Amino acid sequence: MEKDPIPQATSPLATWLSYLEHLHSKAIDLGLARVSEVAGRMAILKPAPFVFTVAGTNGKGTTCRTLESVLMAAGYKVGVYSSPHLVRYTERVRIQGAELPEAAHTASFAEIEAARGDISLSYFEFGTLSALWLFKQAQLDVVILEVGLGGRLDATNIVDADVAVV
């Protein structure tokens, strides 16, 4: 079986997402070593001066939106990473309350692809690294990360949060 060709930074988002779906042998592969290594290579382990991590069973989305709103009202430049998306992939990353264009996501995917070398990443790990890279590029004051299904081994936990909300 031939490997899918690597998309370019200018490839459509749908092409990248299809590529990411087939990149790793497991949809969920808990552990932080792989994703931490790539994040270290990209210097994105501290995406902003202040980081919140939001975890728990219920209310994560509401908590993230509330924090985002309060922090923006106080004059901070804020980024939020959440998952899963409901309609569009671009819902996963917001900066100052707005989704980013697809081209920003595909550019970040190309950066991660170049940095990862032979390290296999899951769809979620790739998406998390993408959010961190986008946040770092935006020079934010605060980042809010919503923990996904992985709990303590979730890819968002590669970032040493200043505040954890449970």
Model region roles, listed by residue range:
Residues 13-24:
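Generic N-terminal amphipathic, Lys/Arg-enriched alpha-helix
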Residues 15, 66, 130:
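Short Gly/charged-rich anion-binding patches and loops
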Residues 163-166:
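Conserved beta-strand/loop subsegment of P-loop NTPase cores
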Residues 18, 69, 133:
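Surface-exposed charge patches
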Residues 7-8, 12, 26-28, 32-47, ...:
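ATP-dependent carboxylate-amine ligase catalytic core
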Residues 50-54, 62-79:
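A conserved segment at the C-terminal end of the G1
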